[in-house]
Curated annotation (Swiss-Prot):
Extra remark: Overexpression of AHL19 results in a decreased flg22-induced expression of FRK1. Overexpression of AHL19 results in an increased resistance to Verticillium wilt.
Disrupted-gene phenotype: Enhanced susceptibility to Verticillium wilt resulting in wilting, stunting and chlorosis.
Official protein name in the record: AT-hook motif nuclear-localized protein 19
Role of this protein: Transcription factor that specifically binds AT-rich DNA sequences related to the nuclear matrix attachment regions (MARs). Negatively regulates plant innate immunity (PTI) to pathogens through the down-regulation of the PAMP-triggered FRK1 expression. Positively regulates defense against fungal Verticillium infection.
UniProt superkingdom: Eukaryota
DNA-binding region: 80-92
UniProt organism field: Arabidopsis thaliana
Keyword Transcription regulation: yes
Compositionally biased tracts (Basic and acidic residues): 61-74
Pfam families: PCC
Length: 315
């Protein structure tokens, strides 16, 4: 049998031939290494990925460009400003206010101790004059001696209404009640004085308005309140008088001038001779007197003011 054609030596260019007796066949060498093949595959994969990313970026750019462009028939809602207070702009807490000076019209409370052997009335009058404040005695306790009281007498009242009898008491007496007021003069009649009730050694109780000195036989404790710028009112107010005062009209005028010190109230009746003239001013500063019109001086609005000059504070 003839040899097959593949067993013979075939001369092929670029291929190495082996002898017929070799049992192995060599693969053709294409001069391509594995590293080169892997690099080419990786480069191809990376190239395809970059192309895909570029395409995605182009698509996003197109979409974003389409969003900014208004479409036909679309209604754009206007941007609303945020309402309310911006964050962090709340009112800061205000610093505390410290009042370093009391109002001159403030009512002050006092606990007064009067030493033994001292005249209670003279001590209170001196305190009111030096501090330029009115004193209202609310209560008191202690022991006094040799008291002179004014009491209403039945015979005196029958003979002349308003009459009173003076009673002089000798010895020591315990204070049951003590009330009254003191103004740093000048003051209207009846606005200054003390009313006292006493208990004797044998249990008798007497009382009345204090006349003359009131000597303390031991420490006397008083509860009092002081005030300033008192206003005197005449009650009841009549309708016509109230209307005139409300309208600012009046016939009389107040003459400012004397401030402090003693003396009678200063008033002028230059306007007219009727009884409803401007009420007198007691120790009132000139800047508190209202200016009058062309017909006369200023007039207080139906009130009698006791605006005493402010003295140096005791603390």
């Amino acid at each position: 049998m003839a040899n097959p054609w593949w067993t013979g030596q075939v001369n092929l260019s670029g291929l190495e031939t082996t002898p017929p007796g070799s049992s192995q066949l060599k693969k053709p060498d294409l001069h391509i290494s594995m590293n080169m093949a892997m690099d080419s595959g990786h480069n191809n994969h990376h190239h395809h990925q970059e192309v895909d990313n570029n395409n995605n970026d182009d698509d996003r750019d197109n979409l974003s460009g389409d969003d900014h462009e208004p479409r036909e028939g679309a209604v754009e809602a206007p941007t609303r400003r945020p309402r309310g207070r911006p964050a962090g702009s709340k009112n800061k807490p205000k610093p505390p206010i410290f009042v370093t000076r009391d109002s001159p019209n403030a009512l002050k409370s006092h606990v007064m101790e009067i030493a033994s052997g001292t005249d209670v009335i003279e001590t209170l009058a001196t305190f009111a004059r030096r501090r330029q404040r009115g004193i209202c005695i609310l209560s008191g306790n202690g022991t006094v001696a040799n008291v002179t009281l004014r009491q209403p007498s039945t015979a005196a009242v029958a003979a002349a209404p308003g009459g009173a009898a003076v009673l002089a008491l000798q010895g020591r007496f315990e204070i049951l009640s003590l009330t009254g007021s003191f103004l740093p003069g000048p003051a209207p009649p009846g606005s200054t004085g003390l009313t006292i009730y006493l208990a004797g050694g044998q249990g008798q109780v007497v009382g009345g308005s204090v006349v003359g000195p009131l000597m303390a036989a031991g420490p006397v404790m008083l509860i009092a309140a002081t005030f300033s710028n008192a206003t005197y009112e005449r009650l009841p107010l009549e309708e016509e008088e109230a209307a005139e005062r409300g309208g600012g009209g009046g016939s009389g005028g107040v003459v400012p001038g004397q401030l402090g010190g003693g003396g009678s109230p200063l008033s002028s009746g230059a306007g007219g001779g009727d009884g409803n003239q401007g009420l007198p001013v007691y120790n009132m500063p000139g800047n508190l007197v209202s200016n009058g019109g062309s017909g006369g001086g200023g007039q207080m609005s139906g009130q009698e003011a006791y605006g005493w000059a402010q003295a140096r504070s005791g603390f």
